[in-house]
Design a protein with these regions (language model features):
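Flexible hinge/capping segments at coil-to-helix
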Residues: 66-79, 83-105, 191-192
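Beta-alpha-beta core module
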Residues: 65-72, 77, 140-189
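Secondary-structure junction motif
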Residues: 12-13, 103-126
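General small-molecule cofactor/ligand-binding pocket signal
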Residues: 30-34, 131-135, 169
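Short, well-ordered beta-strand segments
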Residues: 1-5, 55, 82, 106, ...
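Alpha-to-beta junction loops
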Residues: 46-57, 79, 145-154
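Central regulatory/effector-binding core of bacterial HTH transcription factors
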Residues: 1-63
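Extended ligand-binding regions for polar small-molecule ligands
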Residues: 98, 178-203
Length: 203
């Protein structure tokens, strides 16, 4: 049972599916949609294994600790920037930190992730012309807010389908965040087997 929402799309399973099935032919996936709210995120991640077994998304050690779940890393996703289609930078293929000068960049609040905090520290020190604004939770609302206000949003490429009027652009910086599967601290045999299979494939 794979939990899916706009921020946690099941794309990774689509990509890995042929190889997973090759090694674990009995595996069956059931997609379980859920609404991306702070309450749901807390509830679902703390109770993985009850209604939902795995979720694909970004994470770090602090988040796993806070949410009391495990994570298996599949890749490191580069931080990108989401902009409205009518934004002055939307026509560019790749951005540089210099491009962001004079812009307002929305980033998850300090302390949410050491990876975001490291990027924030560099931008604050080297590019004071970029205004950094905090927010508390990634969901469709924050994309709507940026589309309406012309603010920029720190994002990852797999969120491209979240908002049709927003474009996700790569940036020339070397900041990434772990992306993978979140699962229960005490997983069922099936989930344990899936995790081991995925680990074997992605090594």
């Amino acid at each position: 049972r794979v939990g899916i929402s706009p921020m946690t799309p099941p794309q990774v399973f689509v990509e890995l599916w042929p190889r997973i099935q090759e090694q674990y032919p009995k595996v069956k996936f059931k997609l379980v949609p859920f609404e991306n709210t702070p309450e749901n995120a807390r509830e679902i991640l703390a109770n993985l294994g009850q209604n939902i077994d795995v979720i694909a998304g970004i994470f770090d050690e602090a988040m796993l600790e806070l949410r009391k779940c495990n994570g298996v890393e599949l890749s490191r996703e580069p931080f990108c920037v989401a902009v409205a289609l009518h934004h002055r930078l939307a026509g560019k293929k790749v951005l540089t930190p210099e491009d962001l000068k004079g812009e307002r960049l929305l980033m998850m609040r300090k302390g949410w992730s050491c990876y975001v905090d490291a990027l924030r520290a560099e931008l604050t020190e080297k590019y004071p012309e970029i205004t950094i604004a905090d927010f508390d939770f990634y969901n469709v609302d924050i994309f709507n807010r940026c589309e309406n206000s012309n603010d920029m949003l720190l994002a990852i490429k797999s969120w491209e389908s979240v908002h049709p009027l927003m474009k996700i652009l790569p940036v020339e910086w070397d900041y990434k965040m772990p992306y993978g599967l979140l699962y229960a601290k005490d997983p069922s045999e099936k989930v344990e087997k899936l995790v081991r299979t995925v680990e074997g494939i992605t090594k």
